[in-house]
Structure formats: C-alpha cells, structure tokens
Amino acid sequence: DDQEAILSEVADNVMVNVYYKPFFYKQNTLYELEIIKDLAKYRGYSPLIEHILLYYKESPDYLYSEANKCSLPVYLQKTLNITQVDTFRNQLNSISSFAMFTPAEAPNLICAAYELKLTGILDHSGDAYLLFIIPVERLSRHIERISGIASEHIAAIYLNDQLLYSQSGAAHTLSQYQADDRMLCASGNL
C-alpha cells in the first residue's frame, strides 16, 4: 500500500495537464472551473486525502480546492482552523520538490505538498504547489488497518526521519522511543 506513490502520480498528472497551465486558465475565467472539476476527481484516489488544494505562487491570496476557488486566508481559517496565514504561506514557499509538514496551528493535520513546474521552464523554481490535506486520525486508522496496531498505541508517525505526528505534541527522535509491543517502528512509504 504505497500512498506516497499515489500522491506523486496525482502531482505528475496535474503537472502535465493543460488545464493547470497559467497560459490556459488565464484565457477565460470559465477555465478555472476545469481546474476545480479536475481536482475533484483526484480526491478519491487515496483514502488518506481529505482535501486537495492548488496554490499558484503568482496568486498568493487564492487557492483552488476540489470544491471552488477561494481566498487563502478564508479557506485556512474556515476549513483548516489556521489563522496564521503568513506562517503557512512561508512553510509552503520553503518547499522545493516535495515535503510533508504539520501546520503549527493544526497538529491534527498533515500537509503533503508538491512543488509543480507548470510553465515548462525547467531551470527555475515551481509555479504552484499541490497540497494534500491528510487528517492524522485518518492516517492512524490507515496504519492500524495495515499493521494491526491500534491507533491509540501509535506514539509518533515519521516519514523519512521527519516527525509528522506525536501523541505528546513534542518533537522526539526515534531513538528516544523504546521498542515494545505497543509501538510500530517502521521506515518506508505511507
């Protein structure tokens, strides 16, 4: 069950689809509906995805979701309960290629973010970010289903040595945990 590969495949599909190219959707605002409809079809690709978002760097105050085009501050505050918009935007803008992070104000969410190069110019940074919003509870249930370990016994979730979730809310390294029958220590993909 390689959820990371599924998310990567979606990012690759978006990157090559003409709907998402700035030259295309800027021709007519109705073309923005094609972006929204296309994003909606990807939501069901993975059981982990709660929301799928597209954020263009050239339009830093807006994003596209699987439901609509929305103001970034309004979406973050109303849907994800994130009020520190600039902090979130800075987290995004620090990403090159791919990263997973937990927003400071939303420890119950994991954001898988792919930087997309949509203009075809390969020697520059990306034009947009594709974000998958994954609730920690949904990821824990997924891990429980695969591993058989009850989600309440999962102390922390790591991906490639990066802490994505900790029950205590504090940062720990894997070496600080004692391996026992209540904890899964594993490496690899989601």
Question: What residue spans do the PLM features occupy?
Answer:
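Juxtamembrane extracytoplasmic/periplasmic/luminal helical "stalk" adjacent to the first N-terminal
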Residues: 1-23
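Intrinsically disordered, low-complexity terminal regulatory regions
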Residues: 5, 9-10, 25-26, 33-39
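Short, hydrophobic-rich beta-strand element in sensory/regulatory alpha-beta domains
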Residues: 7, 50-54, 153-157
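Extracytoplasmic/secretory soluble proteins
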Residues: 10-11, 15, 64-67, 168
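A general secondary-structure junction signal
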Residues: 11, 54-58, 159
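Extracytoplasmic/periplasmic sensor domains and loops in membrane signaling proteins
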Residues: 29-39, 68-104, 139, 148-152, ...
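Solvent-exposed, extracytoplasmic
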Residues: 34-46, 118-165
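Extracytoplasmic/periplasmic ligand-binding sensor regions of membrane-associated signaling proteins
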Residues: 43-133
